[in-house]
Amino acid sequence: MFGAMLRYLIGISFFADSRFPWATLTINLLGSFLLAWLTSYVFKKVRLSPHLSTAIGTGFVGSFTTFSTLSVETISLFQDGHNFLAMVYVLVSLLGGLTMSHLGFKVSKEVQKS
């Protein structure tokens, strides 16, 4: 619930007037980094119960990010004739999400070394 509210606030605060779904893209990329970093560093450093870790990871971060909105926005771009933008959006979302997850794991390893 809190993740979804934060997603909504970011969307209306920074990207309200954009035709391109910058809000969802930004949120999903941040969420990919955050979930990787939380699971590979924070949850190992801070002793939390498995239930609380799951609540934070899949509850907060899961509701912050959104695959369903990405899907609907992609279809809307296609329906509005923005085929190239739709394909770029999907590719950047997928490759960017994987890159940000990788970066989250990498940052975690670097922080653990120091």
Swiss-Prot record:
InterPro entries: FluC. The chain crosses the membrane at residues 23-43, 52-72, 84-104. Na(+) binds at G62, T65. Keywords: Cell membrane, Ion channel, Ion transport, Membrane, Metal-binding, Sodium, Transmembrane, Transmembrane helix, Transport. Na(+) is not transported, but it plays an essential structural role and its presence is essential for fluoride channel function. One of its GO terms (biological process) is cellular detoxification of fluoride. It is found in: Cell membrane. GO terms for cellular component: plasma membrane. It comes from the Bacteria. GO terms for molecular function: fluoride channel activity; metal ion binding. The keyword Manganese does not apply. Its main location: membrane. It is a multi-pass membrane protein. It catalyses: fluoride(in) = fluoride(out). Fluoride-specific ion channel. Important for reducing fluoride concentration in the cell, thus reducing its toxicity. Belongs to the fluoride channel Fluc/FEX (TC 1.A.43) family. This is Fluoride-specific ion channel FluC 1.
